[in-house]
Amino acid sequence: MQADAWIGDAVLALWARLQILRDDGVVDGPKFLRMTSNQFLAAVGEPTAVEAQIGRVYREHGEAAAFAWIEDNVAPVFGRQEENRLKRVRPR
């Protein structure tokens, strides 16, 4: 599992950087950290297990499948957390 998690961590990092550049058009280190931290991943599952799953999908099916897994399982949780964070930062 450790090797899969190591690969999964790298795949998640690449996905996060590409996502930030596509959505925001800027390099945003703090957002990257929020998207990839163990604290955030714990909202999805046990962080090492989540990264290992990403790594397994990548190794067995390739980058597109791993990115799709992240889009289906990680991105929605991050989106909800960001909405909540923005509500706290900019109260109505």
Indicate residue ranges for each PLM-predicted region:
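RNase III-family endoribonuclease catalytic core
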Residues: M1-R92
